[in-house]
A protein has these predicted regions:
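Beta-strand/loop-rich accessory regions of lumenal/periplasmic or secreted enzymes
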Residues: 15-339
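Amphipathic N-proximal alpha-helical interface segments
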Residues: 1-13, 92, 108
Length: 339
C-alpha cells in the first residue's frame, strides 16, 4: 500500500524461483573450494593448493533424480586452473577462464550449502591436463600494435537530444527509459511527433531473454543451457561503462538496483546515450538522366545521425553490449554485440 507505506499482504509463490544472487552463492563458493574431496581431485590433475577455483552454474530443472529442482536452489560447480604469473594478490592469473578442469562437477543446494553430488569422471586417473601455459591478459603482458592516429568525436555545439527525468526526445522521437534487474534497459511509450500529435510506435521494447545452450552431451556439460536474463539478470550483471565503452560525447546515467534482501543502492554509469555518424548517408541518389544538363545537380545525399542507448552486461567470461538505435528515417534497431 503505497499511500499508507505499509505491507498489506505477502503471498509465497511456489511456481518459480528468483534469479541467482551473489549474496547467497559467495559463502557457498568458499565452502566448496575448501572441501577435501575437491582439493584432492584438483591435486590429482596437477592443480595445487591456491591454483584451483570452482564456480557455480545454474542448472535449470535438471538433476530432478537427485533433488527437487523447484524447492531447492541447485547450482553445479565446475573448476578452473588459475595458476599464473599475474602479480595480483587475489588471483594468480588474469586469464582465469582459459584452463577449465574437465571431468569434475559438484552439485550443491545453496539454500543450506548441502553437497548433493560430487562427480569425478577421472577418479582413477587419466584426466586431461589443465596446466598448459596461457597468455596473461593485461597490458603489461601483451604485445600491442603501433597506436593509431586519433579519431576524435566532438559536439562543440552540444547534443541534439533532451532528457527530462526518464523521458528522452530526439529528432521527433520520444520515449521513456528505465532499468530492470532482469532485462536491463527497457524503453516504454515510444512514439514519433507529427503535425497532428504523438504517433505511438510501441508501448514497450526490451529483450525478454538470452538463451545460451552449449549442446554438449558430456555428463559435465549437458546442463549448461543458461537463461542469462532469467537466471542471472542482465541488469544485475551490468557493469559500469568507462574507458572506451562509449564515445567521448556520451551522456551517462546511473541506475538504482537492490540487493537480494531488497535494499536499494545506486549503480553508477550503467547507461550511456550518444549520437554518432554511422559513416553512410541516410539517403543518396545519382541521377544519370540529367548528367550534363546545365543547372541541374545530379548527385544528392543527406548525412545520417543515429541516437544510441547503450548498456553492457558481463556474465561469466562474456561481455555483451545492448544498443537501442534510433534513426531519423523512423527506424529503430536493436543490436546485441558480444565482445
Amino acid at each position: 500500500d503505497f499511500e499508507n507505506k505499509q505491507l498489506s499482504a505477502a503471498t509465497a509463490i511456489t511456481s518459480g524461483q528468483p534469479m541467482l544472487a551473489g549474496e547467497e552463492v559467495f559463502p557457498v563458493i568458499e565452502t566448496v573450494n575448501a572441501l577435501p574431496e575437491v582439493v584432492a581431485a584438483l591435486e590429482k590433475r596437477g592443480v595445487g593448493e591456491g591454483n584451483g577455483l570452482c564456480l557455480p552454474r545454474t542448472v535449470g530443472r535438471f538433476f530432478s533424480n537427485l533433488a527437487d529442482p523447484v524447492n531447492s536452489r541447485l547450482v553445479r560447480f565446475d573448476c578452473l586452473n588459475i595458476q599464473g604469473q599475474s602479480g595480483l594478490e587475489i588471483l594468480p592469473t588474469t586469464s582465469a577462464f582459459a584452463r577449465p578442469v574437465e571431468g569434475l562437477s559438484i552439485l550443491v543446494d545453496v539454500e543450506d550449502a548441502t553437497i548433493i553430488e560430487l562427480s569425478d569422471s577421472f577418479a582413477e586417473g587419466g584426466a586431461p591436463p589443465s596446466d598448459f601455459d596461457v597468455i596473461e591478459f593485461h597490458e603489461g603482458a601483451l604485445q600491442t600494435r603501433k597506436p593509431l592516429s586519433p579519431v576524435r568525436i566532438n559536439q562543440d555545439e552540444g547534443v541534439n537530444f533532451s532528457i527530462s527525468g526518464s523521458q528522452i526526445e530526439w529528432q521527433g522521437w520520444r520515449f521513456h527509459l528505465r532499468f530492470d534487474p532482469r532485462q536491463g534497459t527497457i524503453l516504454n511509450n515510444i512514439g514519433m511527433t507529427t503535425e497532428t500529435g504523438m504517433r505511438p510506435v510501441a508501448y514497450e521494447i526490451a529483450m525478454s531473454e538470452m538463451f545460451v545452450p552449449y549442446q554438449d552431451p558430456d555428463q559435465h556439460w549437458f546442463y549448461r543451457a543458461y537463461f542469462d536474463m532469467g537466471e542471472y539478470g542482465f541488469g544485475n550483471m551490468a557493469s559500469e561503462l568507462k574507458g572506451h565503452d562509449c564515445p567521448s560525447n556520451a551522456t551517462f546515467q546511473s541506475v538504482v538496483l537492490h540487493t537480494a534482501v531488497g535494499e536499494p543502492f545506486t549503480a553508477p554509469n550503467r547507461i550511456c546515450i550518444f549520437e554518432f555518424d554511422p559513416g553512410y548517408p541516410s539517403w543518396r541518389h545519382y541521377e544519370s538522366l540529367y548528367a550534363g544538363v546545365p543547372g541541374i545537380e545530379t548527385h544528392h545525399s543527406r548525412r545520417a545521425t543515429h541516437l544510441v542507448v547503450r548498456m553492457a552486461a558481463t556474465i561469466g567470461n562474456y561481455d555483451y553490449f545492448q544498443d537501442y538505435i534510433f534513426q531519423q528515417d523512423g527506424k529503430i534497431r536493436i543490436r546485441l554485440i558480444s565482445t
